[in-house]
Amino acid sequence: MASLGADKKHKVTVVGSGNWGSTICKIVAENTKANPDLFEEAVHMWVFEEDVVIDKSSPYYDPAVGDAPQKLTGVINKYHENTKYLPGIKLPDNIIANPSLQDAVKDSTILVFNLPHQFIGNVCKQLRGHIMPFARGISCIKGVNVSDDGISLFSEWIGDGLGIYCGALSGANIASEIAAEKWSETTIAYDPPPMDNSRAPTPRSNSPANGNGIAPLTPVEMQHKDARGRTSKTKLTPVPAEYPPLDHQIFKQLFHRPYFHVRMVSDVAGVSLGGALKNIVALAAGFVDGRGWGDNAKAAIMRVGLLEMVNFGKEFFGQTVHTGTFTEESAGVADLITSCSGGRNFRCAKMAVAEGLSVEEIEKRELNGQLLQGTSTAKEVNSFLKARGLEKDYPLFTAVHGILEGRHSVDDIPSLVSDS
């Protein structure tokens, strides 16, 4: 595809190398190789360096090395496989595992973030002043941060922390299935900043940047809006015209594969909220399934849960959130279905009810020190709603928190959500 006269290519870096980070890097590297007119072929993947030992049963076992620890980056670059976090999956040979965060992002114009959310602040601190000022980001980090003070999107944490614009990727995306190239879909939310050269209008403003024979934008139209539709405090640097436009078309070319279908939207808040709130609903689905109430009850939970997800987005993000993001996209209803069918929030809640234990007890027993996202999100959302006197407007979210706290039982759910 033509790059509209651009004479420079985009360099891509993936920040993070867990199972999902490595999977996304595999996808991106396949597409940079397939689109040499748009992207530099080499994709750097930042790896938090650690020592690994290659097991004797591995095809990569070297008797000369034996059980001696090896650097994970060295293993990835030599064998083109992340033997620790994505074993058995061959990675493209144009992926370069890099233990230096600042070196990995050098000269990159597209940054893909895929790491645990608790590391965002530290990573942004290390990157500040070391990235291209006009770089653009995509956050693959599911969820949002909810406190009594408000709701913040991880994409905005990144964008504000680095002074760039950052979109979000989320959906019914189980990393191991995608890495094995089993067909799935995802949603990418990206609302191209109005000062960037774009081949299509930004859906919210309907005002494409000039450069395509369109009248120049006014200073007001040129202002970048945040996910709530307010003028952003972050002052963006436009992407230079010598690069291919960073818009829906190019991000689809970067992420879309025959086995990984991408739908583009502009609703960053809706996509981000879907990835967080569905975990609360998944707990409720696990509760009723553990009680043995069957598929009808679980379907009722998903209906009420989806309604509350939409209402929450509309109430706290206003005009920027679209109902269709929740009802039509992978980041909404599809991710909800997956999470309510076999996700770990669902499984742990189901086991807790079936065995007469608390979710916390199951969590400690089953997750090897990891924590459920649903329990923390339920607590944060309840505190947020309670501070605003809105608990009754979200009966399912409130019921889940009540069950986790021991104030309600699963048997109370039908009466608690009866008016939904």
Curated annotation (Swiss-Prot):
Highest rank taxon of the organism: Eukaryota
Ranges of compositional bias, category Polar residues: 199-210
UniProt-annotated binding residues for substrate: 142, 344-345
Pfam families: NAD_Gly3P_dh_C, NAD_Gly3P_dh_N
Gene Ontology cellular component list: cytosol; nucleus
Keyword Ribosomal protein included in the entry's annotation: no
Database matches in PROSITE patterns: NAD_G3PDH
Protein name (database record): Glycerol-3-phosphate dehydrogenase [NAD(+)]
Lineage: Eukaryota, Fungi, Dikarya, Ascomycota, Pezizomycotina
